[in-house]
A protein has these predicted regions:
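Conserved PLP-enzyme active-site core in the AAT-like
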Residues: 1-156
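Conserved C-terminal alpha-helix-loop-beta "cap" of PLP-dependent enzymes
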Residues: 141-201
């Protein structure tokens, strides 16, 4: 807020990332209120949160929390081909600016394969309530079981003051005698489980 106050006439757009790669969600409502108080729009890089609208078990989506626009990478958490993404807005002024810029900078030869994949993905999401319910039920079951591990810790909402995406299974090895990368290696070689990412702890 200090930056917005100091540069009130210069800052027209604030960009934040939420959720993080690990699933932590920012307080978008408070951030959007601060931005709007100073005349700035809020764009959220919601790349890892494209699935949020499809279950109450997930955090609320950015546009519902006051963001003016959001970028969603469908391919990260939904069934869509790599490179597919959406830029969404509920702000008419931004919508006009986006349309004008797309007319200038967008390719005249878009990939119909990727656009078709987006359509297929959106159709799946609109007609798969049962699948999302089952997915969230499985996530909660797995998370409850992982809480019983003696030396490995699974992160959840109780570990942060912010909202958290239960779809991110983040496990800490800080209290174990192996590193995160070593655990990933064991899971891969011994159990054929491939982790998406591994850090030192």
């Amino acid at each position: 807020e200090d930056k917005l106050t100091k540069h009130n006439d210069e800052i027209r757009l604030v960009i934040i990332t939420s959720p993080t790669y690990e699933g932590v969600v920012s307080d978008i409502k408070s951030i959007s209120e601060i931005c709007h108080k100073h005349g700035a729009k809020l764009l959220v890089d919601e790349a890892h949160g494209a699935h949020f609208p499809f279950s109450d078990s997930f955090p609320d989506e950015a546009l519902n929390c006051g963001a003016d626009a959001a970028v969603l990478s469908l391919h990260k958490t939904l069934p869509s081909l790599t490179q597919t993404a959406l830029l969404i807005t509920n702000d008419s002024e931004l919508s006009e600016i986006i349309a004008e810029n797309l007319a200038v900078f967008e390719t005249s030869s878009p990939s119909y394969i990727l656009m078709s994949s987006i359509e297929k993905c959106l159709d799946f999401c609109e007609n798969s309530n049962d699948k999302f319910k089952e997915y969230c039920c499985n996530l909660k079951t797995v998370r409850e079981k992982l809480k019983n591990l003696k030396y490995l810790k699974i992160y959840d909402k109780s570990d942060t003051d912010f909202d958290y995406d239960i779809g991110k299974i983040v496990i800490s090895t800080a209290n174990a005698n192996i590193s995160g990368t070593k655990l990933a290696e064991i899971l891969r070689n011994n159990y054929q489980i491939e982790t998406e990412m591994a850090y030192s702890d």
